[in-house]
Amino acid sequence: MSRFILPFIEKVVDVIGNGHCGFQAIAKFMGLTEQSHIMIRTLLIQELKDHINDYVEVFAGEDRCNYILNGLHPHANMEGCAHLVDKWFTVPDMGHIVANYYKMCVIVLTSLEKSESFFPLRRPPPPAKQNTPIICLGVILNHSVLIYLKNGCPLPPSSIEWHNHKKEDALTWEDDYLDQHELFQKPMVIESGNKPPQPQKESNKAAPILLDTPEKPKQII
């Protein structure tokens, strides 16, 4: 995770690294228990199925889309699936699905080049000046944690796939966050040694990020 973002973090909530950490972090954000990760999976499965044609385009083909759909289905042995990489929470893939289902901005903070903001691909944003929650996941050694950010903090650039596939009624989602995107770009260049950031890939098809680690005790930082 980028060092310059640390002063803008209000709180970090860890979850157990047992193969479900990304889904557990979403559950915690929604005020549920970590054990509700199966419900989160179920809701995201329905979102993906209901809009399958849109996601085939976003994920650059049916093969990737089916892989993500299969990965959302929980394994029969929920206690022993930490090693089943295909069942983990992957980004950027899940960023789009979560943003669309919950109708809010999703932030993933990881390396400089791969941190992204995800917005709903359809539906307009809420009325101006209405506070909209932001779901933020941080990636620490391939393990996802829930992050609460301070108001007005820097936010990473919008997903390339969002720009390429957003519907007309979703065009203005980014507008309220442009200043925060700009705040992210300036220190990002400094931290990367004054080198311009590597361009993001045009497709989600290659090199997804997997979010999980072997099981470890839960702690709240």
Question: What residue spans do the PLM features occupy?
Answer:
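Papain-like cysteine protease catalytic cores
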Residues: 1-10, 16-119
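Deubiquitinase catalytic domains
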Residues: 84-219
